[in-house]
Design a protein with these regions (language model features):
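Core catalytic lobe of class I
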Residues: 1-260
Length: 260
């Protein structure tokens, strides 16, 4: 059974994702695939809403590693077929299986099409004393071909950065020494371009606390700020985005905000 909720930019479909994609999503039509699958935590993930006296949950328990990897492999293969030649795929995971999923992505897409490992870093609090506190998740980025679309993002310089000094142009003098490039009046040549700092692969974005306004009651909901950044890297307005697992629906909301 399929259940649809649709507006001008978002379509939510309740169905077996692999079957639906095979039958209804056109090959080579998708610009961005974002997957936030079960993490192989071997737990039932539950989010309880006290005010509504109800809970939302999904089962992340598997018979074995092979069952889990076979499930993800089938999804990745179908997703690859739906991606256009400039598309990127982002796979969200944690330490439960990130090492396994990297190998699986190499298998499906090819080692040469690996682009980045994003580390989503955040603050968490725990009384655990038996190991280091878990405070990050991983997002693997792969492309379908070498002709992928990638849009650079720049962040602000730190307050202590001397921006003018960074942007001043340099050259080598007659002795091969690097010196500031100067105008005819001996002033230092600068530039009007101040794009900022290129985005790194470590993203420090707050984890959604239980009382966050954007919380919808789904146990593994991701922040809109995180998802918007993924879209901004890989998409232009009106590009097609595919989220096979959907979860809380936050990617669709993020895409709507950015008019994708």
């Amino acid at each position: 059974m399929n259940s649809k909720a649709k507006n001008s930019t978002i379509e939510f479909i309740l169905s077996d994702s692999v079957e639906y994609m095979q039958e209804n999503v056109q090959n080579s039509s998708v610009q961005l695939v974002y997957l936030d699958p079960p993490f192989f935590s071997q737990k039932k993930q539950v989010q309880y809403n006290k005010s509504q006296n109800k809970s939302v949950s999904f089962n992340d328990k598997w018979k074995c590693r092979e069952e889990y990897l076979d499930f993800i492999r089938k999804t990745l293969i179908v997703c690859k077929n739906k991606m256009n030649d400039s598309a990127l795929i982002f796979l969200h995971c944690d330490t439960s299986a990130n090492h396994l999923l990297r190998v699986l992505l190499d298998e499906v897409f090819g080692e040469n099409l690996f682009l980045n490992e994003i580390v989503w870093s955040y603050k968490r609090w725990s009384n655990s004393s038996k190991k280091l506190l878990d405070a990050h998740q991983t997002i693997w980025i792969y492309s379908k071909t070498k002709n992928y679309k990638f849009k650079s993002i720049y962040t602000s310089y730190s307050p202590t950065t001397n921006v003018d000094q960074i942007l001043q142009q340099r050259e080598r003098d007659n002795n091969g020494v690097v010196v500031y490039k100067r105008n005819e009046d001996d002033s230092i040549v600068g530039t009007t371009e101040k794009n900022g700092v290129p985005l790194r692969d470590v993203w420090e974005i707050p984890f959604l606390n239980p009382k966050a306004k954007e919380r919808v009651g789904y146990p593994t909901q991701k922040p809109i700020e995180l998802l918007k950044r993924i879209i901004q890297i890989s998409c232009d307005e009106n590009d097609l985005i595919l989220d096979p697992f959907c979860g809380s629906g936050s990617l669709g909301i993020s895409a709507s905000i950015l008019k994708c």
